[in-house]
Every structure is written in C-alpha cells, then in structure tokens.
Amino acid sequence: MLDLPETTGILVEGEVFELPTWQFWALQEGTLDVDPGYLMNNEGTMPPVVHVDADVPLYDEEGTLLVDGKWGIYYKPDFNFGGVQGGYMPYRVDRPWRDVAIDPYGPASPDFAVGKDFRAVWAAGLAHCQGRFEGKAGLMSHAPSGGIGAFTPDNFPVFDTFCENVYVIADSNHGFKMIGVGALVAKELLGETQALLEPFRYSRYAEGQLHPVSNSPYPWS
C-alpha cells in the first residue's frame, strides 16, 4: 500500500541479509469448555494472563510424546468465549505476504483455523502447567478458531514515518504492549520526538541497531 520494498536489508556484523519486510504467522488459539470461574484467583477476581515458555518434553494423557523441544502456551479465563481461552506458538505462513488471503479473517478462513494437533498440544500444556487441567483434554472446543498476524523482519515493532507524511504503527503482533504507544505517537505527530520510540525506527535494520535475540519459542517475546 505504501510501495515499501518487498525485502529489507539487515546489517549484522558487517554483512547485509535480505529478509521479507512483512511475514505472516498463523496464530493458534482455542478454548477449553469449562466455567471461566474455574481459573479465577483465590479472591475470586480475574488473574493475569499465564504465559509459559518451556523446553521439557510434553506428553498427552496417554503418555504420548507431543513435543520434544521448545514450546509455549498462554491462557486466561474468558467470559466472552465461555471458558479458558488461550493459544500455542504460532507458525510461519510459508508463502509471500502478497499471496496470503487475509480476508476472511480468523475462524472464517479455511486456511488458518486450528485443528486437532493444536487441541491436543494445548490441552497437554494446560495439564502440564496446572494439575486442575489434568484429564480435561476432551473438553477442548471444536469451534473454528485461529487467525494470522503480520510480523516485521526481526519480530519487533516499527514506529516510523514513511513516504514523508504517513506514520506507521506496525505492532508485529505485540498486542497489549501497544496500549501506551498511542500517546507517544500523538506527541511525535505534534513535533515532539519520543526517545522511547527511537529503538523501533525502520532505519535500525540498515544501521545494524538491532534488538537482542530472544530464546523464547514465541516471535513476539
């Protein structure tokens, strides 16, 4: 839309690597059909979102090895979905971003709805994290769920001006972390440069001013 390059040159230790400017990842999310109150805290109020990174073997209820390496889940009680809702690690959509159909989005798309593999591994992850979820895999919802997200070359957000007069907030699927960004961007639009946004300029790729590489299985960590 902004006629930006298909690829971006990234300077790493004196060498330039070309990566897609945008890369879609498929988001794997679903719901365990239990009363949302099943996961409230001891005071009966909403707990924070539980976000787990792990590298231990993950088994299902029958003892079958599902994952032998890095994995991660996140979950929370959700009264909108009517259960415990959350997700597993996303996976790369292995085709150019221009060839990805973003409409219809999410559950309405036959390309990006989760399947039985997700339900099995997410239920196993829940049981691994908290004993109350043991034996609950059969309660996984089969309602269509899932979606896609657009990521930057290094999976960190880009906040910058393009084409002289277009300000872009590309969150790279960092979600709730963007809550405070709007106020900072508003100040920049009024002419007050924000130091907190400087590490997230698009120019960082060409300059080699990159962020640390995370060991998390999630691209947004």
Residue map of PLM features:
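Flavin-dependent oxidoreductases
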Residues: M1-A113, A127, G131-G135, P219-S221
